[in-house]
Amino acid sequence: MASSMRSLFSDHGRYFEAFRRFLNNSTEYQCMREFMDKQLPGIIARIGGSKSEIKVLSIGGGAGEMDLHILSKVKAQYPGVHIINEVVEPSAEQITKYKELVAKTSNLENIKFAWHKETSSEYQNRVMEQKEIQKWDFIHMIQMLYYVDDIPATLKFFHSLLATNAKILIILVSGKSGWLKFWKKYRSRLPQNDLCQYVTSFDIIQMLDSLGIKYQCYDLLSTMDITDCFIDGNENGELLWDFLTETCNFLTTAPPDLRAEIMKDLQGPEFIVRKEGKILFDNSLSFITIEA
């Protein structure tokens, strides 16, 4: 690997911009919203029971777009019930954006928000020091298990926080997506980092089976439009390359042979489909629900 290549995570500003471009060029959030609209009401149908208050815990809530969509479903399912929504998010920038989104969003009455600037591991350590451990009715972990050191321990811990009839929702890339094939083939030749694990739903399901935890898994097709990646000098394409490879300035720092090989692969049927003149990378998602 060329010494000039460095992990995208080493430049937080560029990482968040690349992530924003990914969201703008993929059906990721559209796919999540479809799941929330069609499946979530059934999943949360029993979490409230006759309670006067429902406690929701968001691990890795980011800027809050999906959190608020989830809360709208909880609120619709349990009209008039008070909702406590606590958010664990390590990025101060994301928390600021989340608070700004809440401030300009209507219909959030009866919802009390609290934010904690910490990682899930830091949250776990803090909770374990408390004499009385808070139980939760609904915990969701959206695209964040990649950033956990010990995933089985994390799953076991959050499962232990579930109240009666409570659920956990985990969202991450499907083992059937193009990501698994891409990571298997290229991760050893791309910059290594200590922040991210290359896991898919296949890994999480295996861990849950080993832990004896009951779950259900749903897969939904999502795509990422990478057409701009093959237009010379296209800034959007350059940032999408960075996101795909998790490499800062991939096009200008990658060895020519590696760059050519990846560019060829990402135009082939193993990773993409062509539709209406667009090149679409398979970004399929898995939605895993865990019972108390």
Swiss-Prot record:
Tissue occurrence: Expressed in jejunum, brain > lung, spleen, stomach > liver, kidney.
Native species: Cavia porcellus (Guinea pig)
Binding site for substrate: E28, N283
Region forming the signal peptide: none
Sequence similarity: Belongs to the class I-like SAM-binding methyltransferase superfamily. HNMT family.
Subunit structure, interactors included: Monomer.
The protein's enzyme class: transferase
Protein location: Cytoplasm
A cellular component annotation (GO) from this entry: centrosome
Name by which UniProt lists this protein: Histamine N-methyltransferase
Lineage: superkingdom: Eukaryota
